[in-house]
C-alpha cells in the first residue's frame, strides 16, 4: 500500500486502519491487545481524540475517531505509545507497526454507519467471533462508553 499524504487537521471524523509490521499477528495475545487498548483509552482520556468505534484485530486495528490534535499526532501517540510500553513492560523487541496507515474522512451519516458496521463485523468476517458483541477487543464487545457521533454527521432528524 502506498503511503498516502496525511495533511489533516483536527476538524473531521476519520476511519483509520493501521497494520502491524508485515501483517504479523502481534496483537493476538491478551497482553498485547489489552495493552493497546490501555494506550488507546489513555490518550482518549487526555483529550487527544474522541473515540467513536474501534476493533483490535491480531494484525491491525480499525478506528472511528475525531482527533482533537492532528490526525497524524493522534496516530503517532497511539502507535508510538504502544510501542514504547510493549518494549518496556512486555520486553518486546523488533518492529511493531507498518510506517503508513489508511485514513478516510467520514463525509456523512450514511458513511459513518457503513464504517461503524465494518468495524463491528470485522472479527466476525475473520472468524474470531460469531457476533461483534462477542469480541472483547472491540467497542461492540468490551462495554466501554464511546464518544457521541459528531453533530455535523447526524441527519437533521437525529440532531434535535
Report residues per predicted region.
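Short catalytic/metal-binding and nucleic-acid-binding patches
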Residues: 1-160
Amino acid at each position: 500500500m502506498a503511503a498516502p499524504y496525511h495533511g489533516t487537521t483536527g476538524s473531521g471524523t476519520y476511519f483509520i486502519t493501521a497494520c502491524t509490521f508485515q501483517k504479523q499477528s502481534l496483537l493476538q495475545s491478551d497482553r498485547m491487545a489489552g495493552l493497546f487498548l490501555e494506550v488507546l483509552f489513555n490518550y482518549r482520556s487526555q483529550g487527544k481524540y474522541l473515540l467513536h468505534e474501534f476493533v483490535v484485530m491480531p494484525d491491525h486495528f480499525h478506528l472511528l475517531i475525531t482527533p482533537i490534535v492532528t490526525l497524524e499526532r493522534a496516530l503517532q501517540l497511539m502507535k508510538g505509545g504502544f510501542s514504547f510500553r510493549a518494549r518496556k513492560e512486555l520486553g518486546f523487541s523488533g518492529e511493531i507497526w507498518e510506517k503508513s496507515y489508511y485514513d478516510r474522512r467520514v463525509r456523512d451519516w450514511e458513511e459513518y454507519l457503513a464504517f461503524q458496521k465494518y468495524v463491528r463485523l470485522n472479527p466476525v468476517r475473520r472468524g474470531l467471533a460469531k457476533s461483534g458483541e462477542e469480541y472483547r477487543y472491540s467497542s461492540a464487545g468490551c462495554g466501554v462508553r464511546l464518544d457521541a457521533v459528531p453533530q455535523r454527521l447526524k441527519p437533521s432528524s437525529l440532531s434535535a
